[in-house]
Amino acid sequence: MTELEFHIRQTRHLIDNQPEVISLSRIELSDDGAGGQAAGEPTDLGPQTVRIIGILGTPRRMTPDGREVIVNKSVLGMPDLDIAVGDTFPLAGYDYEVVMVSREPTWRTIAEAAEHA
């Protein structure tokens, strides 16, 4: 077993130990013909199994549109998790917005999410 295979297996174990199924929604932006962008209709990406991890403290992030938000949750997924900044998902009665995605190291995907107002 290679080191990469070992780490991928460990990521799978962490997720399977405390799985959460979330349904991400994504709004694609397109050229509006006037030099700007227009939001399309939300696309449901379907259920995806991840591990949700609470955040200690109140880390803050700036969103691409300039908002400062407090990160409430981390989302741990497999390397092929279909998740992007701006995606939203409901969890335990709250709506969350993905504000950061990292695919490094290559054996996992980690995202940060903020409660969406």
List each language-model region with its residue ranges.
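Short, conserved turn/kink motifs that form compact alpha/beta structural patches or helix kinks used as
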Residues: 1-6, 16-117
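N-terminal low-complexity, intrinsically disordered "leader/linker" segments enriched in small/polar
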Residues: 11-14
